[in-house]
Amino acid sequence: MNQTELLESLKCASEGMVKAMTSTTMKLNFVFIATVIFLSFYFAGLAIQALLRNNIFSNSTRHILIVCLLNSIVHQAVTLETRIHQVYRSFVYSSEPCRLLFHFTECEVELYFYYLTNYFSTYAVFSLTFDRLVSHYKPKYYFSHQYYVSNSLLIIQLLLSLSTYYVGLYGVPLVGYAPICYYTPRLAVNFSKINDFRTATMVFCIIVTIFIYYLSVKSEKQIHRTSYSPGERYIACENVATSQSVCILIVLQFACIMLSSFGVNYIRARESLMSEENFNKIAPFFPGVTYASLCLPLVIYFKTKLTIRNRKLRIGVMTSMYGDVGDHMNRLKKSWE
């Protein structure tokens, strides 16, 4: 019996798999993941409103963030749909182990959208990093060609996602069965290489973004010492704020993806030391991009609220001061030092 025939013969769930898929732990996991997803929908709406009405980012960065938010909504919707199907089967077919699992051909559409949006979400760090890179080193070009920059980066991000999907899933036979439709097809052999490449990309982007943030802070301090031009000071301040936000986003994205990657790899390495039931109870708690898709709108929304509040406080302090123009300018100079 070859590998394909062996996988096709495993139609019925084992006793451990049945216990895991119909357990209270699995149902609680569904409630937890569904809560994360609905919170991400809510905050994605708030974040998009903030970007459209109270934008604190450059137009290029805003464009990238809006596209990434829309992608995260699609990803979360697909994840929720797969989990609803799984929990439905756990109730309806709890006593029929041969109908509990999904054949991978039933999951073809979910796999396509789940992994494509997953990769697009991961490579958002590339677009955001190079957006900051161009902004810092070519500011005049950046501010006069913002939509060209963002569209170019988004196209590269999409090409990276499609290429990764092609290497990982394209042409892989959809044979065998899975308890949840976003599980990796059994004959997909390049996933470890893909995870290594994604990890290397994110580490590189974190290093570059932290470096750009350091340069932005250094540049802002220098401008504050040498220039009283409101325009220069504003641009420098906005560069620091945006670089800081992007840095936070990338670090959180990395943390969520690594939680998923290392978490699943860790329990897989110890799969022989634990029962099949326990393994399948723990694995669904590690959908890293699901958590990252909640972190993205949270950072955008609360960073926007915080920045607006700080601006109002600063304006309130400046407008509440009394004295002649000379006194006012002296106070401004002192506050900018």
Curated annotation (Swiss-Prot):
Membrane topology annotation: Multi-pass membrane protein
GO biological process: sensory perception of chemical stimulus
One GO cellular component term noted in the UniProt record for this chain: membrane
Source organism superkingdom: Eukaryota
Compartments, record wording: Membrane
GO MF annotation: an example: G protein-coupled receptor activity
Predominant localisation class: membrane
Encoding gene (name): sra-17
Protein name (database record): Serpentine receptor class alpha-17
Family: Belongs to the nematode receptor-like protein sra family.
Keywords: Membrane, Transmembrane, Transmembrane helix
Matching Pfam families: 7TM_GPCR_Sra (PF02117)
Organism: Caenorhabditis elegans
InterPro entries noted in UniProt: 7TM_GPCR_serpentine_rcpt_Sra (IPR000344)
Positions of transmembrane segments: 28-48, 110-130, 155-175, 197-217, 247-267, 282-302
